[in-house]
A protein has these predicted regions:
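Short, small/polar-rich loop/turn modules that mediate ligand/substrate recognition or access, typified
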Residues: 141, 146, 209-211
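Substrate-binding pocket helix/loop in short-chain dehydrogenase/reductase
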Residues: 64-66, 70-75, 179
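Residue(s) in the substrate-gating loop at a strand-loop-helix junction
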Residues: 109
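C-terminal substrate-recognition "lid" of short-chain dehydrogenase/reductases
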Residues: 86-89, 187-216, 221
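Active-site helix of classical SDR
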Residues: 89, 125, 133
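Short, flexible catalytic-loop segment of classical short-chain dehydrogenase/reductase
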Residues: 130, 147, 152-166
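Conserved glycine-rich Rossmann-like NAD(P)H-binding loop of the short-chain dehydrogenase/reductase
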Residues: 1-12
Length: 223
């Protein structure tokens, strides 16, 4: 089950997965409790239950000093990055308990391990996700449900291009080069690399893994 706000993007993703059977989509905003509950109910109706949750909704928000941020800007990032993850967990836990097992994977960020000027809402939200994951892992371990987080570094996708243009509006390419210079592996990661880590955490190869944060950052945090 693919869940997201954009029907057009969901359709495009489903078409990319045309080689797989039983791929369907449900339009819902992760910050909308009723819509999230409905998405989980639709999943149960279509597949008989919930085995795996990948909480992947996220936004970078606008970059600004703390004193310049508006309440709306700060709340918007936290609603998507924290409330969205929590709501997805909230409505997937009971179906997983009924099956006696499950794997919850929250896509967070290296931002949950560091500070960064002008990124207060994003940094705060990703620290919160790590705390939520650790707490949920402790609550749910006895029910056979594993909860882990993935902490990507810079990944070659829309979000990093948005950040590049905000870091240096006059020369996004220079921002790109500066960010890459901070990565020991000297490149951005790919969506596929993050997906492969999620597959590991979703599968039987990781049945003793819970409450952990898996960095995929080209060595950024180690540097």
């Amino acid at each position: 089950m693919l869940v997201g706000r954009s029907a057009e993007k969901l359709k495009a993703t489903r078409e990319r997965l045309s080689n797989f059977e039983n791929v369907t989509e449900f339009v819902a905003d992760a910050t909308d409790e009723a819509a999230t509950k409905a998405a989980v109910e639709a999943t149960i109706e279509a597949f008989g239950g919930v085995d795996i949750l990948v909480a992947n909704a996220g936004t970078e928000g606008n970059l600004a000093p703390i004193e310049s941020l508006t309440m709306r800007e700060f709340e918007s990032v936290l609603r998507t990055n924290v409330i969205g993850v929590w709501l997805s967990m909230k409505y997937c836990v009971e179906p997983m308990k009924k099956r006696g097992n499950g794997s919850i994977i929250a896509i967070s960020s290296i931002a949950g391990m560091i500070g960064s000027p002008t990124m207060a809402p994003y940094i705060a939200s990703k620290h919160a996700v790590f705390g939520l994951v650790k707490t949920a892992a402790l609550e749910l371990a006895a029910s056979g449900i594993r909860v882990n987080a993935i902490g990507p570094g810079p990944i070659d996708n829309r979000m990093i291009r948005s950040l590049e243009s905000q870091f240096n509006p006059e020369d996004a390419a220079a921002a790109h080069d500066f960010i890459v210079s901070k990565i020991p592996m000297q490149r951005y990661g790919t969506n596929e690399e993050v997906a492969n880590l999620a597959l590991f955490l979703a599968g039987d190869e990781s049945t003793y893994c819970t409450g952990s944060i898996y960095m995929i950052d080209g060595g950024w945090i180690a540097a």
